[in-house]
Regions:
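ATP/NTP phosphate-donor binding region
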Residues: 1-69, 79, 316, 323-331
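Glycine-rich phosphate/pyrophosphate-binding beta-alpha loops
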Residues: 143, 147, 202-216, 291-292
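Glycine-rich beta-strand-to-loop/alpha-helix junction loops that act as flexible
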Residues: 9, 72-74, 96-98
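Short Gly/Thr/Asp-enriched flexible loops that form oxyanion-binding sites at enzyme active sites
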Residues: 77-89
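ATP/nucleoside-binding phosphotransfer catalytic cores, i.e., glycine-rich phosphate-binding loops
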Residues: 189, 220, 230-331
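Gly/Ser/Thr-rich active-site loops/lids in small-molecule metabolic enzymes
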Residues: 158-168, 211-212, 217-240
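Catalytic core of DAGKc-family lipid kinases
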Residues: 43, 86-203
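Short N-terminal binding/cap micro-motifs at the start of the first secondary-structure element
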Residues: 12-16, 210, 309
Protein backbone atom coordinates (compact mmCIF):
# COMPACT_ATOMS: atom_id res chain seq x y z
CA UNK A 1 0.00 0.00 0.00
CA UNK A 2 1.18 3.50 -0.86
CA UNK A 3 0.32 6.54 1.27
CA UNK A 4 0.45 10.11 0.01
CA UNK A 5 0.18 13.18 2.22
CA UNK A 6 -0.74 16.41 0.41
CA UNK A 7 -0.11 19.55 2.47
CA UNK A 8 -1.66 22.89 1.54
CA UNK A 9 0.42 25.66 3.17
CA UNK A 10 -2.16 28.38 2.40
CA UNK A 11 -5.15 26.67 4.04
CA UNK A 12 -6.44 28.05 7.33
CA UNK A 13 -4.64 30.52 9.57
CA UNK A 14 -1.32 28.68 10.01
CA UNK A 15 1.07 26.99 7.59
CA UNK A 16 0.71 23.26 8.33
CA UNK A 17 3.98 22.47 6.54
CA UNK A 18 6.01 23.90 9.44
CA UNK A 19 5.29 21.11 11.92
CA UNK A 20 3.15 18.46 10.23
CA UNK A 21 5.87 16.62 8.24
CA UNK A 22 7.72 15.67 11.42
CA UNK A 23 4.46 14.59 13.07
CA UNK A 24 3.69 12.43 10.04
CA UNK A 25 7.12 10.80 10.21
CA UNK A 26 6.64 9.93 13.88
CA UNK A 27 3.10 8.58 13.37
CA UNK A 28 4.16 6.53 10.35
CA UNK A 29 6.98 4.95 12.34
CA UNK A 30 4.55 4.07 15.16
CA UNK A 31 2.20 2.50 12.61
CA UNK A 32 5.00 0.42 11.12
CA UNK A 33 4.98 2.25 7.79
CA UNK A 34 8.42 2.29 6.21
CA UNK A 35 9.76 5.62 4.86
CA UNK A 36 9.68 4.32 1.27
CA UNK A 37 5.97 3.48 1.62
CA UNK A 38 4.77 7.06 2.01
CA UNK A 39 5.37 10.44 0.42
CA UNK A 40 4.80 14.00 1.65
CA UNK A 41 4.16 16.64 -0.99
CA UNK A 42 3.28 20.34 -0.69
CA UNK A 43 0.75 21.92 -3.05
CA UNK A 44 1.73 25.23 -4.65
CA UNK A 45 -1.14 26.25 -6.93
CA UNK A 46 -4.89 25.83 -7.40
CA UNK A 47 -5.67 22.35 -8.70
CA UNK A 48 -2.30 20.96 -7.61
CA UNK A 49 -3.83 18.48 -5.13
CA UNK A 50 -5.99 17.10 -7.94
CA UNK A 51 -2.98 16.71 -10.22
CA UNK A 52 -0.84 15.01 -7.58
CA UNK A 53 -3.60 12.66 -6.43
CA UNK A 54 -4.44 11.70 -10.00
CA UNK A 55 -0.82 10.97 -10.87
CA UNK A 56 -0.40 8.87 -7.72
CA UNK A 57 -3.61 6.92 -8.41
CA UNK A 58 -2.48 6.14 -11.95
CA UNK A 59 0.93 4.99 -10.76
CA UNK A 60 -0.55 2.84 -7.98
CA UNK A 61 -2.98 1.19 -10.37
CA UNK A 62 -0.18 0.37 -12.80
CA UNK A 63 1.82 -1.25 -10.01
CA UNK A 64 -1.23 -3.05 -8.58
CA UNK A 65 -1.12 -1.20 -5.26
CA UNK A 66 -3.72 0.39 -3.02
CA UNK A 67 -3.35 4.14 -2.49
CA UNK A 68 -4.26 6.25 0.52
CA UNK A 69 -4.25 10.03 0.06
CA UNK A 70 -4.47 12.31 3.09
CA UNK A 71 -5.00 16.01 2.44
CA UNK A 72 -3.92 18.55 5.04
CA UNK A 73 -5.99 21.62 4.25
CA UNK A 74 -9.64 22.53 3.96
CA UNK A 75 -12.65 21.24 2.05
CA UNK A 76 -11.29 22.64 -1.21
CA UNK A 77 -8.03 20.68 -0.95
CA UNK A 78 -9.91 17.52 -0.01
CA UNK A 79 -12.30 17.96 -2.92
CA UNK A 80 -9.41 18.45 -5.35
CA UNK A 81 -7.83 15.15 -4.27
CA UNK A 82 -11.19 13.37 -4.34
CA UNK A 83 -11.69 14.58 -7.90
CA UNK A 84 -8.18 13.43 -8.77
CA UNK A 85 -8.81 9.82 -7.70
CA UNK A 86 -12.38 9.68 -9.05
CA UNK A 87 -12.84 6.43 -10.98
CA UNK A 88 -9.85 4.68 -9.38
CA UNK A 89 -11.10 1.74 -7.33
CA UNK A 90 -7.66 1.30 -5.77
CA UNK A 91 -7.59 4.77 -4.17
CA UNK A 92 -9.27 6.57 -1.26
CA UNK A 93 -8.95 10.07 0.22
CA UNK A 94 -8.95 11.26 3.82
CA UNK A 95 -8.66 14.72 5.33
CA UNK A 96 -6.55 16.30 8.03
CA UNK A 97 -8.57 19.44 8.88
CA UNK A 98 -6.26 22.43 8.64
CA UNK A 99 -8.65 24.67 6.68
CA UNK A 100 -11.08 27.35 7.80
CA UNK A 101 -14.32 25.41 7.24
CA UNK A 102 -13.66 21.67 7.38
CA UNK A 103 -17.32 20.82 6.84
CA UNK A 104 -16.82 17.45 5.18
CA UNK A 105 -15.69 15.71 8.36
CA UNK A 106 -18.65 16.93 10.46
CA UNK A 107 -20.90 14.32 8.85
CA UNK A 108 -18.66 11.56 10.20
CA UNK A 109 -16.94 12.70 13.39
CA UNK A 110 -15.08 15.41 15.25
CA UNK A 111 -12.18 17.60 14.23
CA UNK A 112 -10.09 16.07 17.01
CA UNK A 113 -10.60 12.57 15.60
CA UNK A 114 -9.55 13.69 12.13
CA UNK A 115 -6.46 15.52 13.45
CA UNK A 116 -5.27 12.36 15.23
CA UNK A 117 -2.65 10.90 12.88
CA UNK A 118 -2.53 7.59 14.75
CA UNK A 119 -6.30 7.21 14.38
CA UNK A 120 -6.12 8.19 10.71
CA UNK A 121 -3.47 5.59 9.90
CA UNK A 122 -5.41 2.93 11.84
CA UNK A 123 -8.71 3.75 10.11
CA UNK A 124 -10.09 2.49 6.85
CA UNK A 125 -11.94 3.26 3.61
CA UNK A 126 -15.70 3.51 3.13
CA UNK A 127 -17.80 4.18 0.04
CA UNK A 128 -20.05 7.23 -0.09
CA UNK A 129 -22.25 8.95 -2.64
CA UNK A 130 -20.91 11.89 -4.58
CA UNK A 131 -22.68 14.71 -6.42
CA UNK A 132 -21.90 15.61 -10.01
CA UNK A 133 -22.58 19.34 -10.16
CA UNK A 134 -22.20 22.24 -12.58
CA UNK A 135 -19.21 23.26 -10.45
CA UNK A 136 -17.61 19.81 -10.57
CA UNK A 137 -17.59 16.85 -8.22
CA UNK A 138 -18.82 17.42 -4.66
CA UNK A 139 -18.96 15.23 -1.56
CA UNK A 140 -20.87 17.56 0.74
CA UNK A 141 -23.29 20.32 -0.30
CA UNK A 142 -24.02 22.43 -3.37
CA UNK A 143 -25.66 25.71 -2.37
CA UNK A 144 -27.02 28.67 -4.31
CA UNK A 145 -28.38 32.08 -3.40
CA UNK A 146 -27.57 34.46 -0.55
CA UNK A 147 -24.97 32.28 1.20
CA UNK A 148 -23.16 31.55 -2.06
CA UNK A 149 -23.20 35.27 -2.93
CA UNK A 150 -21.55 36.04 0.41
CA UNK A 151 -18.82 33.46 -0.30
CA UNK A 152 -18.35 34.82 -3.81
CA UNK A 153 -17.86 38.35 -2.47
CA UNK A 154 -15.21 37.53 0.14
CA UNK A 155 -12.12 37.61 -2.17
CA UNK A 156 -12.97 41.17 -3.22
CA UNK A 157 -12.81 42.37 0.38
CA UNK A 158 -9.69 40.34 1.16
CA UNK A 159 -7.82 42.52 -1.32
CA UNK A 160 -8.38 45.51 0.98
CA UNK A 161 -5.31 46.17 3.20
CA UNK A 162 -5.68 44.85 6.77
CA UNK A 163 -8.96 43.13 5.87
CA UNK A 164 -8.51 39.51 6.97
CA UNK A 165 -10.76 36.51 6.48
CA UNK A 166 -13.29 37.23 9.23
CA UNK A 167 -13.59 40.94 8.37
CA UNK A 168 -13.94 40.12 4.67
CA UNK A 169 -16.74 37.70 5.55
CA UNK A 170 -18.58 40.31 7.62
CA UNK A 171 -18.25 42.97 4.91
CA UNK A 172 -19.54 40.57 2.26
CA UNK A 173 -22.60 39.81 4.42
CA UNK A 174 -23.28 43.52 4.90
CA UNK A 175 -22.98 44.11 1.16
CA UNK A 176 -25.50 41.38 0.38
CA UNK A 177 -28.00 42.47 3.03
CA UNK A 178 -27.86 46.05 1.73
CA UNK A 179 -28.62 44.92 -1.80
CA UNK A 180 -31.53 43.15 -3.45
CA UNK A 181 -32.43 40.04 -1.46
CA UNK A 182 -33.94 36.94 -3.04
CA UNK A 183 -34.34 35.55 -6.54
CA UNK A 184 -37.16 34.03 -8.55
CA UNK A 185 -35.87 30.54 -9.31
CA UNK A 186 -37.28 27.64 -11.30
CA UNK A 187 -36.41 24.25 -9.80
CA UNK A 188 -36.79 20.85 -11.44
CA UNK A 189 -36.56 18.16 -8.77
CA UNK A 190 -36.86 14.62 -10.17
CA UNK A 191 -39.35 15.93 -12.73
CA UNK A 192 -41.33 18.15 -10.33
CA UNK A 193 -41.19 21.84 -11.29
CA UNK A 194 -41.30 24.56 -8.64
CA UNK A 195 -41.24 28.31 -9.30
CA UNK A 196 -40.14 29.94 -6.04
CA UNK A 197 -39.16 33.38 -4.74
CA UNK A 198 -36.30 32.14 -2.61
CA UNK A 199 -33.47 33.34 -0.42
CA UNK A 200 -31.21 30.34 -1.02
CA UNK A 201 -31.12 26.59 -1.39
CA UNK A 202 -28.88 23.70 -0.38
CA UNK A 203 -28.64 20.38 -2.21
CA UNK A 204 -27.05 18.02 0.26
CA UNK A 205 -25.10 14.79 0.37
CA UNK A 206 -23.40 15.72 3.65
CA UNK A 207 -24.79 17.64 6.58
CA UNK A 208 -22.94 20.93 6.99
CA UNK A 209 -21.32 23.66 4.93
CA UNK A 210 -20.19 27.26 5.30
CA UNK A 211 -18.11 26.52 8.39
CA UNK A 212 -20.80 24.72 10.37
CA UNK A 213 -24.25 25.56 8.96
CA UNK A 214 -26.16 22.32 9.57
CA UNK A 215 -28.36 22.43 6.47
CA UNK A 216 -29.18 18.71 6.40
CA UNK A 217 -28.99 17.35 9.96
CA UNK A 218 -30.20 13.86 8.99
CA UNK A 219 -28.48 13.44 5.61
CA UNK A 220 -26.88 10.04 5.01
CA UNK A 221 -23.95 10.22 2.59
CA UNK A 222 -24.40 6.68 1.31
CA UNK A 223 -28.17 6.30 0.86
CA UNK A 224 -28.34 7.25 -2.83
CA UNK A 225 -30.44 10.37 -2.19
CA UNK A 226 -29.97 14.14 -2.12
CA UNK A 227 -31.64 16.17 0.63
CA UNK A 228 -32.92 19.42 -0.88
CA UNK A 229 -33.76 22.48 1.22
CA UNK A 230 -35.16 25.68 -0.29
CA UNK A 231 -35.58 28.76 1.90
CA UNK A 232 -38.29 31.12 0.68
CA UNK A 233 -37.67 34.85 0.30
CA UNK A 234 -38.31 36.63 3.61
CA UNK A 235 -37.80 40.07 5.12
CA UNK A 236 -34.42 41.14 6.47
CA UNK A 237 -35.84 40.97 9.99
CA UNK A 238 -36.85 37.33 9.52
CA UNK A 239 -33.51 36.32 7.99
CA UNK A 240 -31.72 36.41 11.35
CA UNK A 241 -34.28 34.08 12.95
CA UNK A 242 -34.19 31.66 10.04
CA UNK A 243 -30.42 31.55 9.82
CA UNK A 244 -30.17 30.78 13.53
CA UNK A 245 -32.50 27.82 13.07
CA UNK A 246 -30.71 26.77 9.89
CA UNK A 247 -27.21 26.95 11.40
CA UNK A 248 -28.17 24.76 14.35
CA UNK A 249 -30.07 22.22 12.23
CA UNK A 250 -33.24 22.73 14.26
CA UNK A 251 -35.39 23.24 11.16
CA UNK A 252 -35.56 19.48 10.53
CA UNK A 253 -36.25 16.59 12.91
CA UNK A 254 -37.39 12.98 12.56
CA UNK A 255 -37.49 13.04 8.78
CA UNK A 256 -39.52 16.23 8.35
CA UNK A 257 -39.49 19.99 8.73
CA UNK A 258 -40.43 21.20 12.19
CA UNK A 259 -43.65 23.21 12.39
CA UNK A 260 -41.84 26.53 12.92
CA UNK A 261 -39.87 25.98 9.69
CA UNK A 262 -42.76 24.92 7.44
CA UNK A 263 -43.78 28.46 6.31
CA UNK A 264 -40.23 29.24 5.21
CA UNK A 265 -38.67 25.99 3.96
CA UNK A 266 -39.40 23.54 1.16
CA UNK A 267 -37.92 20.05 1.56
CA UNK A 268 -37.53 17.28 -0.98
CA UNK A 269 -35.47 14.11 -1.47
CA UNK A 270 -34.25 13.57 -5.00
CA UNK A 271 -31.79 11.93 -7.36
CA UNK A 272 -31.36 14.96 -9.62
CA UNK A 273 -31.98 18.68 -9.20
CA UNK A 274 -31.62 21.57 -11.62
CA UNK A 275 -32.33 25.25 -11.13
CA UNK A 276 -32.15 28.42 -13.15
CA UNK A 277 -33.03 32.06 -12.65
CA UNK A 278 -36.58 32.98 -13.63
CA UNK A 279 -36.37 36.72 -12.92
CA UNK A 280 -34.17 37.96 -15.78
CA UNK A 281 -31.49 39.21 -13.38
CA UNK A 282 -28.61 37.15 -14.69
CA UNK A 283 -26.85 34.04 -13.41
CA UNK A 284 -27.21 32.54 -9.94
CA UNK A 285 -24.13 32.26 -7.75
CA UNK A 286 -23.48 28.70 -6.56
CA UNK A 287 -20.88 27.09 -4.32
CA UNK A 288 -19.76 23.51 -3.76
CA UNK A 289 -16.85 22.27 -1.64
CA UNK A 290 -14.61 25.28 -2.13
CA UNK A 291 -15.68 26.18 -5.67
CA UNK A 292 -17.82 29.29 -6.17
CA UNK A 293 -19.08 30.81 -9.44
CA UNK A 294 -22.14 32.35 -11.16
CA UNK A 295 -24.02 29.88 -13.37
CA UNK A 296 -26.89 30.25 -15.85
CA UNK A 297 -28.12 26.81 -14.83
CA UNK A 298 -27.09 24.58 -11.95
CA UNK A 299 -27.54 20.83 -12.18
CA UNK A 300 -26.80 18.33 -9.42
CA UNK A 301 -27.04 14.55 -9.79
CA UNK A 302 -26.26 11.91 -7.19
CA UNK A 303 -23.57 9.35 -8.01
CA UNK A 304 -24.34 6.43 -5.65
CA UNK A 305 -21.30 5.05 -3.80
CA UNK A 306 -18.96 6.62 -6.36
CA UNK A 307 -16.46 7.95 -3.82
CA UNK A 308 -13.99 6.19 -1.53
CA UNK A 309 -12.97 8.12 1.56
CA UNK A 310 -10.76 7.36 4.55
CA UNK A 311 -12.11 7.70 8.08
CA UNK A 312 -10.04 7.71 11.30
CA UNK A 313 -10.52 4.59 13.39
CA UNK A 314 -13.30 5.84 15.76
CA UNK A 315 -15.34 7.28 12.86
CA UNK A 316 -14.69 4.21 10.70
CA UNK A 317 -15.93 1.88 13.45
CA UNK A 318 -19.06 4.01 14.07
CA UNK A 319 -19.83 4.14 10.35
CA UNK A 320 -19.46 0.35 10.01
CA UNK A 321 -21.63 -0.29 13.09
CA UNK A 322 -24.37 2.03 11.82
CA UNK A 323 -24.46 0.31 8.44
CA UNK A 324 -24.57 -3.13 10.09
CA UNK A 325 -27.51 -2.00 12.24
CA UNK A 326 -29.33 -0.58 9.21
CA UNK A 327 -28.86 -3.84 7.30
CA UNK A 328 -30.25 -5.78 10.26
CA UNK A 329 -33.29 -3.48 10.43
CA UNK A 330 -34.03 -4.05 6.74
CA UNK A 331 -34.01 -7.82 7.24
Amino acid sequence: MRTLFLLNPTAGKADCTRTLPQQINVAAARAGIAPEEYTIQVTNHAGHARELANAAAQQARQSGEELRVFTAGGDGTFNEALTGIYGYANAAVGCLPFGSGNDFLRTFGTKEEFLDLDAQLAGGPVSIDLMQTSLGLSATICAAGLDAQVAYGIPKFRRIPLCGGEMAYVLSIVEQLCGHIGRRVEYTIDGETLDVDCLMCAICNGRTYGGGFCAAPEAQPDDGWLDVYIIRKVSRVTIAKLLGMYKSGKHFQNGQLVRAAEPYFIYRRAKQVSLRAADGRGPIVATADGECAPKEQITVQVQPLAGRILLPKPAFERFAAQRTAQSADRT
